[in-house]
Amino acid sequence: MSIQNEMPGYDEMNRFLNQQGAGLTPAEMHGLISGMICGGNNDSSWQPLLHDLTNEGLAFGHELAQALRKMHAATSDALEDDGFLFQLYLPEGDDVSVFDRADALAGWVNHFLLGLGVTQPKLDKVTGETGEAIDDLRNIAQLGYDESEDQEELEMSLEEIIEYVRVAALLCHDTFTRQQPTAPEVRKPTLH
């Protein structure tokens, strides 16, 4: 089962976004929602925040709002399921070039970092493995390519980068959403 089975298809989501004049690709929108979830936003405040970031604070029309709720729910479910089902929402198919996928990946990562940053304002202070992954994501967001490159080689490299980004997103989710262990409740001795 893939996450695409639970959300509208990429082209359908693109149509909804274009109808609303949202100015984001489906990959960018998924990156933004994923970043917000991975940053620890797991309540209903994601919708107004999304509206503020993408639509000048205005709610989206019914079709797009419903599609975004499905995207949010499917993404959240995939991340909570130990991340095994979580996949980046990128264009696929024979008519999609490796360059289109590379551009979509850069957009996904940029918006993931935005979503992560609005939920974790001290992102630049994160250290350790997660801090390194965030630094790597910043570099990947600047992804560039030469159109004269061997497309087959570029496709293989792109798949490796996509998998790295997926794992980095899961690491962020684990870092920012796991329950912090609390001290066991100290029971006072009872006098009988």
Curated annotation (Swiss-Prot):
Gene Ontology, cellular component aspect: cytosol
InterPro entries documented for this protein: YgfB-like (IPR011978), YgfB-like_sf (IPR036255)
Record protein name field: UPF0149 protein YgfB
Origin: domain of life: Bacteria
Gene that specifies this protein: ygfB
Gene3D superfamilies: YgfB uncharacterised protein family UPF0149, PF03695
PANTHER family: UPF0149 PROTEIN YGFB (PTHR37528:SF1)
Transmembrane segments: none
Family: Belongs to the UPF0149 family.
